[in-house]
């Protein structure tokens, strides 16, 4: 990894890496870690320690999950409150209802041990 970053910086001195765990084209980390909260926190911690400007795909900080291979399931609306945990009118029409294991942002803000905190 260091070798690649050194080569990138030599090719472009203004190079800034942009590490990420997942995005709209990939499965969310919660699925990769099978909803294991400690593994998800560890992955996020590693990403934040990498050089560059890390990108957090919306919902990663809550443990939001996607399911299947449909793009629409990777673009579900952010769930700010418990009311948002079911499929909302803002969800893409072809999206499946995806059960979320972790609480909403509103609920996680109150829990000092949550993924968000």
Language model regions located:
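Aromatic-lined glycan-binding groove of carbohydrate-active enzymes
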Residues: 2-24
């Amino acid at each position: 990894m260091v070798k690649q970053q050194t080569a990138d910086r030599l090719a472009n001195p203004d190079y800034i890496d942009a590490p990420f765990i997942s995005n709209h084209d990939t499965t969310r980390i919660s699925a990769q870690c099978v909803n294991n909260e400690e593994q998800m926190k560890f992955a996020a911690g590693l990403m934040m320690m990498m050089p560059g400007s890390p990108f957090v795909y919306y919902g990663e900080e809550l443990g939001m999950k996607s399911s299947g291979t449909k793009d629409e399931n990777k673009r579900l609306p952010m769930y700010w409150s418990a009311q948002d945990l079911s499929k909302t009118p803002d969800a893409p029409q072809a999206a499946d209802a995806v059960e979320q294991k972790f609480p909403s942002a509103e609920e996680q803000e109150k829990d000092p041990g949550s993924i968000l905190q």
